Amino acid sequence: MADTRWQAVYNDLRGQIDRGELAPGDQVPAEFDLAERYGFSRSTVRLALGRLERDGVITAGAGSLGRQVRRRELIKWNLTRFELGAYADDPDNHIDQWEADAHSEGWDARQIVADVAELSAPDEIARYLRVKHGTRLVRRRRLRYVSKPGVPERLAMIADTWTPLSIARLKIDGVAPLLQPTSVVYPGGIYRALGFRQVQFHDEIQVRMPTPDEADLLHVQPGTPVGQHARIGIDATGRRVRVLVSVFAGDRQRLRYDLDVPERRPTDDVARDE
């Protein structure tokens, strides 16, 4: 019976949110008021609210603000265009391609280099770059922020670029750009400016729960997963010259790919159902 009661409260509130009767930014009624409305105990109401929090449709509430219906202004990331085709880095205005793409989607965007460090390769990064676990690499961490009228600035993405030491230490005009603690922009990108033309990308996407560090930086609600996009850059010799690992709140980002479909011809011995 207890399960049925909290589910009844959950279903009613979720329906109000889905129909827009409780709109983004609206205050969710207090536990005491909901208990009176439905005629159930506050503990039953709390179970329903906890489920809505885990679904990511209401905030967990803090202090006098209480719980609110979450705003869902999605950030679109066009990965077909990102780092492909006409490279949109703008050295004159100190804007790289991510910022240019964010601007094209209507966002004001900025990024900071939060950290440049020589670290031992974690297992996952070692697999991406095909190096031994513990190999010393340079990690360059950028924090990417977006805002627009009516939407306060928020961290959209943690972008970590991992590079072999032999590449990270290369210099242009006496400066190693991958070791700089500030944003560096070159026509065609840093790696091309260093002499590494990436001829192939391998992308891997996963959804997982955030680490404590990621949850703190992204301000994700309890129970909210993060998305992780890893792009491995490979040069003409087959060498993996870097991996860019981007982590973002799973309820704030939409990834887009446009993929051409090659013409396929049926064969006599293979049946197809399209």
Show where each model-derived region lies.
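A short alpha-helical element within helix-turn-helix/winged-helix DNA-binding domains
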Residues: 25-40, 52-53
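HTH-adjacent hinge/linker in prokaryotic transcriptional regulators
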Residues: 4-10, 36-37, 50-133, 169-182, ...
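DNA-binding alpha-helical recognition surfaces that contact promoter or target DNA
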Residues: 47
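Mid-protein regulatory/catalytic core that forms ligand/cofactor-binding pockets
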Residues: 87-228, 234-237, 241-242
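Residues in the helix-turn-helix
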Residues: 44
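Acidic, metal-coordinating catalytic segment for phosphate/diphosphate chemistry
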Residues: 246
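Short helix->loop/beta-hairpin flanking segments within DNA-binding domains
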Residues: 8-26, 37
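Polybasic (Lys/Arg-rich)
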Residues: 239-240, 252-254
